[in-house]
Swiss-Prot record:
Record-linked Gene3D superfamilies: Leucine-rich Repeat Variant
Protein name: Condensin-2 complex subunit G2
Lineage: Eukaryota, Metazoa, Chordata, Craniata, Vertebrata
Modification Phosphoserine occurs at: S30
InterPro entries per UniProt: ARM-like, ARM-type_fold, Condensin2_G2
């Protein structure tokens, strides 16, 4: 009793410290004092006295320290921490916090019979000061907000004002902090929204914040947030329209995964709405989504999101009222969309129709319902007969989904008609691979309904030849269908598509198809649940059916079973081979023959050592399987040692028995899997076999080189290669010195062709190249020096009148030069000690080309060049190809690239033809797309580099144009070979350097070339009456036709080209009637292409204005320019005003 009285008395100005002490004790969990318990124990009179004292203390505190001064004190306190007002303010805040704490606890115990007027006054005062509190007093703000929320929830007097305050504060805080707890608290007082009049000016801020909630992910993802958002639809009819516009405007930026939540918000709002609000949600929101779902372009980022929203409503058809609503809202737009002239509108409408089927009103009579469904079946049939492939594909999806879902309810004749149309006609639609693909992607939907299996079992065999479709995606879809048939046991897949056809496709098809085919037939040829002997029998059967298909099958087999099973199969095949060998050795013994007849297996009857194809096939399968589980064996040392020992024991015998070349290659590959010590006899003789080869008739040398590389003996091969390459003997220093020396002639034969083949193989395969480059640098330098001799040989050939090399023949010298260039790059990359790779050897080769080769070709007669054409062309191609690869992998710095571009000027100046153009365009493309250079080098260096890129491109087009002028017909097919690299270069410039100097320069060059050619053609016309405007690309001159054709491949390039064309016309870079007419011809052709730019008319307008300045020519006598002027103005008039 004394404590209650003491607490009440402490609520005063004089004993305020005791009051604060009580509140501190309440916070201390170790102290028995509890504020809530104390308040529960107070009598009615004590409560009223306490509340009156709280009001008095609050009033006195605020009078002594008004809230409006707190902001000023806070600002001053930042500059002067010793301000005398600051401690006073902090004390006042502490007292008010304590008062709010007691009031919050009191709200829970208020009884309606008690006089809580003083408490109400306190709440109103605190509500009034809330907005004036400084930002730093977050704790006090939160406490007053909690009071407002609690006051609203209790429904006490003045709850409207308290609720409005709490609503605004929580709404603002939830948007600022993005806290889920604030969203939940806001939902608790959501009814407070009705306290705000929608039309009041004060509600404008509320509207903005509420609309912001609809694009706030925190609200959309949280259940309470979605409830709150759907509730907002009930505030005002006009606000519904604002909500819908906000969501529509933000759809592009929202994740697709959020669309189901957005749809749920609309659906909840629709379920709870009535009257005018329901009508607004249906016709202004849901039907608006339907309209845009039909009319939006498929490539629009919003289209798929709109469809997600509509899909949610389609899925809710079982809910009361949804089906009727969908029928009513779709009726005025969907059927019209299905018959629209625009094919994309029809396609979009078809998607919605298929997803929403059946669209009906549950209130229909039975007759009305039957008529409506029949009408929709007819619409579905129209879809699969539509002339537009995408609509037909959607129709196929509809047929399959509807048939699967409503199989029992659909009339049998309609089902048969639909499926015959799909499997008998659309599966063989020659006009569209997408339609054929849709058939096989959608038929598995029907297979999910078991009732469809008997009918499909009759129809599907007609599709067997689809496995050989010329479109990969169709073949993939067809095999997926076979896998589905196998999974659901609808039919035997080999009755639909014979095993022979499957193996043929497995042999030749791409990885996506082959992997699926292996999955399809895996259990047939590797039945892991049967004895291991059966595995081997099936393996032999597969090899004998199709050896190449067997290789592909076992290449992917490890993806469908454990590595232990693959290892078992390897040893089962080894046992099989051993048994065949042993049976051959025992063939002379009659006793053994009788015994074998009794215990003969299937393999004993079908397999023999003399069956070379089967033996080679089994050995190949072992190699493939071993490669597949190589990593697993590395992790299982015991299994690896066991396998190595077993094969080390039998491989020498295999080499004796299997002498055919087809068997030798897999045997050598198996040897490479073993350490050299495991097969000492063979490993010691490999280098001798390679040395004794005279000519290369097969590929056995490749596997022998693999063996040496895997054994770490590549150094022996390197020595052999160097020995076989011819060397230029050093010049004698003096006659005296030569007399004192004894000459020893090395009789080792020189085999440069074979040496280069070995070298090519080592350098081409990554693992072997790694072994080669691990050899000491000194030996590699010797090899490089030997290869460098090819330069002297090639130079000699170009110089000598007879055209015969000294040591190499022509082909060998060129081969050696190519290997020299490639090897020099690998060596410098391997042994460079600095951060950057200095390609000095390749740079020296470029200098040699520039200073030695090209001068030999300058000013030479045609006959001289023709004799050496293949040599100098291949030298240049080899050098440019290696340089292109260097730039592509990022080894060439800007200095190297600039030197390369400078040398290209010399090449273009000296030689003629197209042979270097593709490579040079590739180099320009790689330089333009090398973003690393752009980031790491100075702007000045990059500017110089790209100036060179543009200059080289311009010079190259000039050279090509010159060739076209001299030999137009011969040049046309040659130019087609460079169209792809030209397109790649232009698109790279467009992608990486749009609106930069190099971009504008390249476009200007592309404009100048056709303008000059077309102008030249116009000026050469003898009969001006024959002049007509071009109707298509083929009406342009040859070079212009090729260039404009390349430009028209990309819509982005077309837009930039047209912009640059307009700039050239406007600035006067293109002037004169003839040149302006050439521009007109270009834009007429572009306007006929598939990427039509709206800016073409802007160019036409610019040309029209320029031509009007030449109006006085109509006063002159008839001339070419007057005719061109009049015809161009006439054409422009028709073009601009159709």
């Amino acid at each position: 009793m004394e404590k209650r009285e003491a607490f009440i008395q402490a609520v005063s100005k004089e004993l305020v410290e005791e009051f604060l002490q009580f509140l501190q004790l309440d916070k201390d969990s170790s102290n028995p004092f509890s504020l809530s318990e104390l308040l529960d124990e107070l009598s009615r009179k004590q409560k009223e006295e306490l509340w009156q004292r709280l009001k008095d203390l609050l009033t006195e505190t605020l009078l002594e320290s008004p809230v409006d001064r707190w902001q000023t004190v806070e600002v001053e306190g930042a500059d002067d921490m010793e301000s005398e007002h600051s401690p006073k303010m902090r004390k006042s805040i502490k007292i008010i916090c304590a008062i709010v704490t007691v009031i919050l606890a009191s709200v829970s115990i208020i009884n309606e019979h008690e006089n809580y007027g003083a408490l109400l006054e306190c709440a109103v005062i605190l509500n009034g000061i809330l907005y004036a509190l400084p930002e730093s007093e977050q704790k006090l703000q939160n406490s007053i907000q909690d009071l407002c929320v609690k006051w609203w929830e209790r429904g006490l007097p003045a709850k409207e004002d308290m609720g409005k305050t709490a609503f605004i504060m929580l709404l603002r805080r939830s948007l600022e902090t993005k806290s889920g707890a604030d969203v939940c608290r806001l939902w608790r007082i959501h009814q407070a929204l009705y306290c705000f009049d929608y039309d009041w000016e004060e509600s404008r801020e509320i509207k903005d914040m509420l609309l912001e909630c609809f694009i706030n992910v925190n609200y959309i993802k949280k259940e309470e947030g979605r409830r709150f958002l759907s509730f907002l639809f009930s505030w005002n009819v006009d606000f519904i329209k604002m909500i819908h516009e906000t969501i529509k405007n933000q759809l592009a930026g929202l994740q697709k995964s959020l669309m189901v939540h957005i749809a749920e918000i609309y659906f909840r709002a629709w379920k709870k709405a009535s009257g005018k609000m329901l009508e607004t949600i249906e016709y202004d929101c849901i039907q608006d989504f339907m309209f845009h779902g039909i009319h939006l372009l498929r490539r629009s980022p919003v289209h798929s999101k709109v469809r997600e929203v509509l899909s949610y409503f389609h899925q809710q058809k079982v809910r009361q009222g949804v089906e009727e609503m969908l029928y009513r809202l779709y009726k005025p737009i969907l059927w019209r969309g299905l018959k629209a002239r625009n094919s994309e509108v029809r396609s979009n409408a078809a998607l919605l129709f298929v997803e929403a089927f059946p669209i009906r009103d549950p209130n229909f009579t039975a007759t009305e319902m039957d008529n409506e469904i029949q009408k929709q079946f007819e619409e579905l049939y129209n879809l699969i007969e539509d002339p537009y492939p995408r609509v037909r594909s959607t129709g196929i999806l509809g047929v399959c989904k509807i048939s699967s879902k409503y199989w029992e309810m659909m009339p049998p004749n309609i089902l048969v008609d639909f499926l015959k149309k799909v499997t008998g006609e659309l599966a063989f639609d020659i006009s569209s691979a997408d339609v054929r693909c849709s058939v096989f992607k959608c038929l598995p939907i029907i297979l999910d309904n078991k009732l469809s299996h008997p009918l499909l079992e009759q129809l599907l065999p007609t599709l067997r030849y689809s496995l050989h479709d010329n479109s990969e995606k169709v073949r993939v879809a067809f095999v997926d269908l076979l896998l589905k048939i196998k999974a659901v046991r609808a039919a035997k897949f080999w009755k639909i598509c014979p095993m022979e056809d499957i193996l043929v496709r497995l042999e030749m098809d791409s990885r996506p198809v082959s992997r699926r085919l292996v999955s399809l037939i895996f259990n047939s040829f590797l039945p892991v649940n049967q004895p291991e002997e059966v595995w081997c029998e099936r393996c032999v059967t597969l090899i004998q059916m199709n050896r190449a298909a067997a290789r592909r099958f076992y290449q992917y087999a490890h993806e469908h079973t454990a590595s232990t099973n693959i290892a078992k199969l390897i040893h089962v095949i080894r046992h099989c081979l051993n048994a065949c060998i042993q049976r051959t050795l025992r063939e002379g013994s009659e006793a053994h023959k009788e015994c074998e007849k009794e215990n003969a297996s299937v393999l004993d009857k079908t397999l023999s050592v003399n069956d070379t194809a089967s033996m080679a096939g089994l050995l190949e399968i072992i190699v493939i399987l071993w490669k597949n589980i190589h990593r697993s064996l590395e992790n299982n040392k015991e299994a690896k040692i066991y396998t190595i020992n077993k094969f080390a024991a039998v491989l020498p015998e295999y080499l004796k028995v299997f002498k055919d070349e087809r068997c030798k290659i897999p045997l050598f590959m198996l040897m490479s899997f073993l350490p050299a010590s495991a097969v000492p006899v063979f490993s010691c003789g490999v280098i001798s076999v390679l040395r004794n080869q005279e000519s290369v008739t097969g590929r056995s040398y490749c596997t022998l080189l693999d063996c040496l590389c895997s054994w770490g003996q590549v150094g022996h091969v390197l020595e052999l290669i160097v020995d076989w390459l011819p060397t230029v003997p050093p010049q004698a220093k003096s006659n005296l010195a030569s007399k004192r020396k004894v000459e020893i002639n090395d009789t080792c034969s020189v085999k440069p062709e074979l040496a280069l083949l070995y070298m090519e193989y080592l350098l081409t395969h990554p693992k072997n190249r790694e072994c080669l480059l691990s050899v000491p640098q000194k030996k590699l330098n010797q090899l490089l020096k030997a290869l460098e001799g090819s330069k002297a040989e090639l130079e000699s050939f170009l110089q000598s009148p007879s055209g015969n090399p000294l040591n190499f023949n022509k082909a060998t010298a060129l081969h050696a030069f190519g290997l020299y260039c490639r090897m020099s790059v690998h060596l410098q990359y391997k042994f460079c000690s600095e951060e950057k790779i200095h390609l000095s050897i390749l740079d020296d080769t470029g200098s040699w080309l520039e200073n030695k080769v090209l001068p030999l070709l300058e000013d030479q007669e045609e006959e001289y060049l023709k004799l050496r054409k293949d040599v100098y062309q291949q030298i240049i191609q080899t050098y440019l190809a290696v340089c292109k690869d260097v730039v592509m992998v990022g080894l060439g710095d800007p200095k190297f690239q600039m030197q390369l571009l400078q040398r290209s000027f010399g090449i273009m100046k000296t030689v003629k033809g197209f042979f270097y153009v593709s490579l040079l365009l590739g180099i320009l493309k790689e330089i333009a797309g090398n973003t690393i250079i752009h980031k790491t080098d100075s702007d000045e260096k990059v500017t110089v580099l790209f100036d060179l890129v543009q200059e080289v491109f311009q010079k190259m087009l000039e050279c090509i144009a010159c060739i076209f002028r001299k030999q137009p017909e011969e040049s046309l097919p040659l130019f087609h070979s460079v169209q792809t690299p030209l397109h790649e270069f232009i698109t790279t410039i467009q992608s990486w350097h749009k609106d930069t100097a190099v971009h504008h320069a390249v476009l200007s060059t592309l404009i100048a070339a056709p303008v000059v050619e077309i102008s030249h053609q116009l000026q050469k016309v003898s009969d001006i009456e024959e002049l007509t405007s071009p109707q298509c690309l083929h009406d342009l001159p040859p070079f212009s036709r090729c260039l404009v054709g390349v430009i028209m491949k990309s819509s982005d390039v077309v837009r930039s080209f047209v912009d640059e064309l307009k700039a050239c016309v406007t600035s006067g870079d293109v002037e004169g009637i003839v040149c302006l007419t050439a521009v007109l011809h270009i834009i007429l052709v572009i306007n006929k292409g598939k990427h039509i730019s709206a800016k073409v008319k802007e160019v036409a307008t610019a040309v029209y204005r320029k031509l009007k300045t030449f109006m006085e020519i109509t006063l002159e006598e008839d001339s070419l320019e007057r005719f061109l002027y009049e015809s161009s103005m006439r054409t422009l008039g028709e073009f601009l005003n159709p």
